[in-house]
Amino acid sequence: GASALLIASVVLTFLYLGERSAGNTAEMLFRADTLWYAPLHISYSVGVDGISVAMLLLSAVIVFTGTFASWRLQPLTKEYFLWFTLLSMGVFGFFISVDLFTMFMFYEIALIPMYLLIGVWGSGRKEYAAMKLTLMLMGGSAFLLIGILGIYFGSGATTMNLLEIAQLHNIPFAQQCIWFPLTFLGFGVLGALFPFHTWSPDGHASAPTAVSMLHAGVLMKLGGYGCFRIAMYLMPE
């Protein structure tokens, strides 16, 4: 599975570069949209640009090496790789999401396995580290959810698609002053920005090697990517 992810990411990178070299100037390439829930205009909407392609390739390399680092992990090897795969799926899904709800869903999918991966297969004060990490990140998720809902209703859009909301550019400045701090705070906790970084050292110290690799190399980058993709992109003022 990890090998397939790495190969797919490399192929996607070359396809993306080929499209750009051919003169394709679309903001997002390889778009796919499927309506999930019509009343709230929730869609499974994915695509890639230069930033997301780079993050996908980085994530694939770390998942690939992390898989080999965990090859002889005991006990409950199958269960470990199940949760490790779910964590990886959340990370990849987050980077390709173009819909606010889809992005938040994959964000949560990436966070939930961390508790078990550290609490069960970690070392040292693993239960304390897992609980602290989970509580702080879920607290950040609550702020993020409020911010996302505020963006959706404040924009007056009939979609949760990031590109379409950005094109409307009609979130009032007064509301941006409310929703931007909430979304920035939500992603800032995951990005371990000061003073919300105290969960990170405990998590690194207690996590298995592969999880610590994914934690430092990819998971924390979700925070910075989310700040750029949602907070700054939709509320530039």
Tell where the protein language model's regions lie, with residue ranges.
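Transmembrane helix-loop-helix hairpins at membrane boundaries of multipass inner-membrane proteins
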Residues: 1-68, 72-82, 157-170
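Hydrophobic residues within membrane-embedded alpha-helical segments of Major Facilitator Superfamily
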Residues: 4, 55, 62, 86, ...
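Alpha-helical transmembrane segments of multipass membrane proteins
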Residues: 10, 64-68, 89-93, 116-117, ...
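Juxtamembrane/interfacial segments at transmembrane-helix boundaries in multi-pass membrane proteins
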Residues: 17-43, 141-198, 202, 226-237
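Alpha-helical multi-pass transmembrane bundles of energy-transducing inner-membrane proteins
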Residues: 19-20, 79-86, 90-176, 209
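Structural signature of hydrophobic alpha-helical transmembrane segments
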Residues: 48-59, 100-113, 176-189, 237
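C-terminal ends of transmembrane helices
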Residues: 63-74, 116-125, 191-205
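Membrane-interface helix caps and helix-loop-helix hairpins in membrane proteins
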Residues: 72-74, 95-104, 234-237
